[in-house]
Regions:
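Phosphate-binding site recognition
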Residues: 1-366
Length: 366
């Protein structure tokens, strides 16, 4: 069994929804109530149902941590960890004196608390409370604060914290059943994953689970029929389809849901996808980058070296990988030697290039 899996997909492609689903499936609390969520679904008559409700689950999301300095970022991280401890306040009555002091120092956000070791300690308390049941750890949007820290220049301090925080809980932790992390990018190996030799990375290139992030053609057709909007299907494909994940072609789910709600073909995803890192790297780019952007805007295919399991180093040479992993580009066919063919996935992204990239950056190089 792979102990830790990292799923990297663009923003708003279902990562958090899948993590929430796993939380409710595996969680040992409210087992019978949670089981009802899966009644009548495909998994309900599979052997996997014996795993339902069998494990303590810790679910943490870092999706909203986008602070301008390390002090504020660290403050928010501690708030998240403290709130997580608060969910498990019931453990306090079963802890010995030393463990209770550890627990309360985090719960009450004391000055010299062991924040780096706090997540592993929580798995230990849960393991003990549930009579040696190992713990499932779910970390959502792990890279949001890391990307922000690079832009705001406190990257080294943040990496120093997370290297131990994740290393303690995900590596050689006898209390861990398995861990799942999600994000957009895999951060460079000398960063937080340097010690995790048990890490399996599932990316947009991976065939396994490829259809479970984004919506398939069949799923979109079913939704469109439900809303009596089949007549829009051709335009829906042009606007929101076109992403290639593994062997699956998928639609942008955020855009589809918003389109069905508003019944208007327009760009929904680009306002929530996070563009500041891309803008930062583009501002450091050269004319060659802009010429490639022009080709893409004109619906041409460009060929670029893309590392399948990229370890992003926040360098302008990685800009095409950032475009690809963030959802602004997609694979346009088979690999040619060392290079992948890349294209814009759909009209929604084309409108983004028109409004932001072409208008803002072409003038800088004339």
């Amino acid at each position: 069994r792979v102990m830790v899996t990292l799923f990297t997909r663009p923003r708003r492609f279902g990562k958090t929804l899948n993590m929430s689903m796993m939380k409710y499936f595996f969680e040992i609390e409210n087992t019978e109530e949670n089981k009802k969520l899966f009644d009548g679904l495909a998994i309900s008559n599979k052997e996997y149902m014996k795993e339902q409700g069998q494990y303590p689950v810790i679910f943490i999301s870092f999706r909203n941590i986008e602070e301008e300095n390390w002090e504020d970022c660290y403050f928010e991280i501690k708030n998240i960890i403290s709130r997580t401890y608060n969910e498990f306040e019931f453990l306090r009555g079963t802890l010995n004196q030393s463990e209770l002091a550890e627990f309360d120092s985090i719960w009450l956000k004391k000055e010299k608390a062991d924040w780096k070791g706090s997540l592993k300690n929580l798995t230990r308390y849960l393991y003990k409370y549930y009579d040696r049941k190992k713990v499932v750890v779910l970390i959502d949007e792990y890279d949001t604060p890391i990307i922000q820290s690079y832009q705001e220049k406190y990257y080294k301090k943040l990496i120093s914290f997370f290297k131990r925080f994740y290393g303690d809980v995900m590596k050689d932790n006898e209390y861990l059943q398995f861990g799942i992390m999600t994000g957009i990018l895999r951060i460079a190996k000398e960063g937080i994953f340097s010690g995790l030799n048990n890490l399996k990375v599932n990316t947009i290139f991976s065939e396994k689970y490829s259809e479970y992030y984004g919506l398939t053609e069949e799923e979109v057709l079913e939704a469109v029929k439900y809303y009596d909007m089949e007549y829009e299907m051709q335009d829906i494909r042009k606007w929101y389809d076109g992403y290639q994940f593994g062997k699956s072609e998928v639609y942008n789910p955020w855009s589809i849901i918003n389109f069905l709600n508003e019944r208007e073909l327009k760009a929904y995803w680009i306002g929530v996808s996070g563009n500041s890192m891309i803008n930062d790297l583009l501002s450091k780019g050269d004319r060659h980058i802009v010429e490639n952007l022009e080709k893409l805007f004109n619906e041409e295919i460009i060929y670029k070296v893309v590392r399948d399991y990229t370890e992003y180093k926040f360098d302008s040479s990685d800009i095409w990988e950032l475009f690809l992993y963030s959802g602004y580009l997609t694979i346009a066919g088979e690999k040619q030697g060392e290079e992948y063919p890349l294209r814009l996935p759909n009209k929604e992204i084309q409108s983004f290039f028109r409004k932001i990239f072409i208008e803002k950056f072409i003038g800088n190089y004339d």
